Amino acid sequence: DWECLPLHSSCDNDCVCCKNHHCHCPYSNVSKLEKWLPEWAKIPDALKRCSCQRNDKDGKINTCDKYKN
């Protein structure tokens, strides 16, 4: 049975991260920002990467249905 990705792994949704982590995309607003940037100011893909981060008390938690039971 497939387990879950460890902390700091690349992810595209909460379900691939472990239950006590969530998939965090620090630059999820980058696409909006890029519209306003000059053509040469490209933001590297590495910065746009989402990764599994620890759940925290600010409500950043894993919302995947498979963990809800």
From Swiss-Prot:
- Which residue range or ranges hold the Oxytoxin-type inhibitor cystine knot (ICK) domain? 1-68
- Location in the cell: Secreted
- Tissues showing expression: Expressed by the venom gland.
Q: Which cysteines are joined by disulfide bonds?
A: 4-18, 11-23, 15-64, 17-52, 25-50
Q: Which residues form the signal peptide?
A: none
GO annotations of cellular component type:
extracellular region
What Gene Ontology molecular-function terms does this entry list? calcium channel regulator activity; toxin activity
- Predominant location of this chain? secreted
Identify the keywords attached in UniProt to this record, alphabetized: Amidation, Calcium channel impairing toxin, Disulfide bond, Ion channel impairing toxin, Knottin, Neurotoxin, Secreted, Toxin, Voltage-gated calcium channel impairing toxin
Residues annotated as carrying Asparagine amide in the record are 69
What more is known? The primary structure of the mature peptide is identical to that of omega-oxotoxin-Ot1a from Oxyopes takobius (AC P83288).
- Record text about domains: The presence of a 'disulfide through disulfide knot' structurally defines this protein as a knottin.
Q: What does this protein do?
A: Weak blocker of vertebrate P/Q-, N- and L-type voltage-gated calcium channels (Cav1 and Cav2). Is both paralytic and lethal when injected into lepidopteran larvae. Is not toxic to mice.
| Family stated for the protein in its record | Belongs to the spiderine family. Spiderine subfamily.
Q: What is this protein called?
A: Omega-oxotoxin-Ol1a
Q: Which organism is it from?
A: Oxyopes lineatus (Lynx spider)
